[in-house]
C-alpha cells in the first residue's frame, strides 16, 4: 500500500539538488499558467497543521525534510512523477507519512485526481470540518463534507455502511512523549448522522428491502410518509377488496342480483317465496311490504260501517244510509204505478221522502232545516233582529229586505231586480 512508502532523507539529498532546481523552474512556469504549484518552495509546514504544537520528536522528523512540493495540477503527469521521485528517493533516515498530519484546503483537494486522493486520503485530517476521516470511510465522501460548508444539502452516511462499525479517532495525550505502544489510543464513538436527518426519518437503501417502484404510495402516486406507514389504517390501504363486492356485498342465491344492504336482499327474497308477512288485524289482508300495510290501515280510519242491503253501498253515517234507502223505496212505488205508454211514464221521478215530521202539526219535511224553520212558526220566535230599528224577523231574507229600507232604497224594486235576475 502507498501508505507504507517512505520519504528518503540524509544521504539521498545531494542527488536531489538538480531535481529541486527543476522543481523551482516548474513552479515559476506554473504560476504564469495559473496552475496549482506554489510560487516558492516552502518547508514541510505547508503539509502539516500546527507543527509547533506537535511533540518534539515529530518536529525533528519533520525538519529533517527540507520541503515537499505542493500537489501538482491535474493532468501534469511530469510534475506528479517528480514529486513521487522525491518521496521515494533514499533509503536512510526514513520518515513515514503517518508521522506527519497532512492538511489540504477544499480547493486543493478538489484539484486532485483520483490517484492522488487515494494516496493522501487515508491520512488527511480536515480540521476545519471538525471530522476525522476514518479508514472506514472512503475519501470521495469529502466532497459531501465540502457541500456542507458551502450551504448545500447536508449529507448523512449510509446506515448500512455505518452499522456495526466504530469510528476510529486518534487522541494525543499532550505529555510530549510518543504514544504508548505501536498503536495509538483509540476513542470509540457511536455512528452519528448530521443534524438534518431527524429521528423519525427513514433512510432507505435499495439493498435493504423492496425496490423503489414497489414502495407504498397514495392515490396520487406520491410515496407515503413514515408517519403514515405507522398508522393502523395503512393495512386497509394496502388490502382493498374489489369495488363491486365492496359496494354490493349481498347477493341473491337464486337470481344472482346484488344488494347493498341485507334488508334489501331479504325483501327481494320474498318475491321468490311469495311470503306476505304483514297482515291487517281488521280485515285480515296481508302485504309483502310494511308501507303497503300502513297505507291500507289508513282506509280503516274512514270506515263506512253502514252498508245498504240492496245495492251493497257503504256509508260513513247511518243518516246517509237512510237517505239512500228512500231512493230504493220510491223507485219501487214508481214501478208499482201504471203510467201506460206515455212519455211521462218513462221519466217517472220518485218523490222526495219526507222523514222529518213536525210533532205539533204532523207535517213532514224532506230536509231538517225545513223542519227547523217550520218549528219557528209554532213557537213565534223571530231570531233575526234589525240593528237599527229593533225589528225582528223569522227568516233571514226577510231581514235583508228590511235593511234596504234604511239605505233609502225601495225594498220592492230591489227585490224585483233580484228575482228578475233569476
Curated annotation (Swiss-Prot):
Residues 157-251 are annotated as: Transactivation. PROSITE patterns: KRAB (PS50805), ZINC_FINGER_C2H2_1 (PS00028), ZINC_FINGER_C2H2_2 (PS50157). CDD domains: KRAB_A-box. A zinc finger (C2H2-type) spans 250-272, 278-300, 306-328, 356-378, 384-406. InterPro entries: KRAB, KRAB_dom_sf, Znf_C2H2_sf, Znf_C2H2_type. GO terms for molecular function: DNA binding; zinc ion binding. Residues 95-167 form the KRAB domain. GO terms for biological process: regulation of DNA-templated transcription. It comes from the Eukaryota. GO terms for cellular component: cytosol; nucleolus; nucleoplasm. The keyword Repeat applies. Keywords: DNA-binding, Metal-binding, Nucleus, Phosphoprotein, Repeat, Transcription, Transcription regulation, Zinc, Zinc-finger. Residues 172-191 are annotated as: Disordered. The modification Phosphoserine is found at residue 410. The keyword Oxidoreductase does not apply. It is found in: Nucleus. Transcriptional activator. Activates transcriptional activities of SRE and AP-1. Belongs to the krueppel C2H2-type zinc-finger protein family. This is Zinc finger protein 641. The lineage of its organism: Eukaryota, Metazoa, Chordata, Craniata, Vertebrata.
